[in-house]
Amino acid sequence: MQDIRDASGSDGAITTLLSRPDPPTALFTAQNMITIGAVRALRRLRLEHRVALVGFDDFLLAEMLSPGVTVVAQDPMAMGRTAAELLFDRIGGSTRPPEVRLVPTTLVRRGSGEIAPTLA
């Protein structure tokens, strides 16, 4: 799926995807609002305990849902600190070539990503 930008678009796309004859047993969403739409669709279809879900980036209340939403959490403080360091180096006259800095992520297991596939 592509060109989905909000929770309602995600909800509709996930509903369509899960209505197929051979629906997926797991979903990975790449943005918070898409994850929220996926949660809505799974709950409405009563599949929240049958289809695994892992989202990229944490969001408020992810742990309060049932099951809690498993996410790949970013570290925004480390990202900001790294960006600021590179910016201030450049402002200070650094002529180093562009570089890639990797900021580690963390898998936060809350239950939704650990749902085992089931046969229909």
Locate each region found by the language model.
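Short helix-capping segments at alpha-helix termini
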Residues: 20-22, 43-49
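A short acidic/histidine/glycine-rich donor-binding loop in glycosyltransferase catalytic cores
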Residues: 69-71
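Alpha-helical structural signal in soluble globular domains
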Residues: 11, 16, 37-45
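Hinge/cleft segment of the Venus flytrap/periplasmic-binding protein
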Residues: 49, 76-120
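Surface-exposed charged/polar residues within alpha-helices that form helix-capping/stabilizing sites
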Residues: 16-19, 89
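Hinge/beta->alpha junction and helix N-cap segments in small-molecule ligand-binding domains
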Residues: 1-13, 26-36, 56-60, 73-82, ...
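Glycine-rich, charge-decorated loop segments at or immediately adjacent to ligand/cofactor-binding or catalytic sites
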Residues: 62-67
